[in-house]
């Protein structure tokens, strides 16, 4: 199983465990190689199991974190939004939009974890 497949399964594992998203991302290996996660690879993983995309979309519609990313569907278009700076992109394809959101969302969580780890080392 590659990194994109492991990341794609995070919401499902989260729902059936008592582990945090940060802990699950660490278990996937993402924190050691965040650059290895690409939109194309995530989109392929979602094509293999489209139900995972639905879990991510549900999670993304719940996100209103300062600095984080969210996703919503309006009139058949998906808006991926940064709550840090208002940047956004709009996609029509559901799986591609979801993949774009996932890469940005886990990137944000990964950066928060790295900042926390650096602060603890001081």
Question: What does each of the following model-derived ranges do?
Answer:
Residues 1-61:
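Negatively charged, low-complexity tracts enriched in Asp/Glu with abundant Ser/Thr
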Residues 33, 88-89:
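Short N-terminal micro-motifs specific to bacterial/archaeal maturation
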Residues 36, 91-92:
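Conserved aromatic
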Residues 48, 52, 73-77, 103, ...:
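Amphipathic alpha-helical interaction surfaces
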Residues 59-87:
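Short aromatic-glycine-(Arg/Gly/Cys) micro-motifs in beta-strand/loop hairpins
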Residues 92-105:
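A short, charged, amphipathic alpha-helix used as a generic interaction element across diverse proteins
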Residues 110-122:
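Intrinsically disordered, low-complexity charged/polar segments
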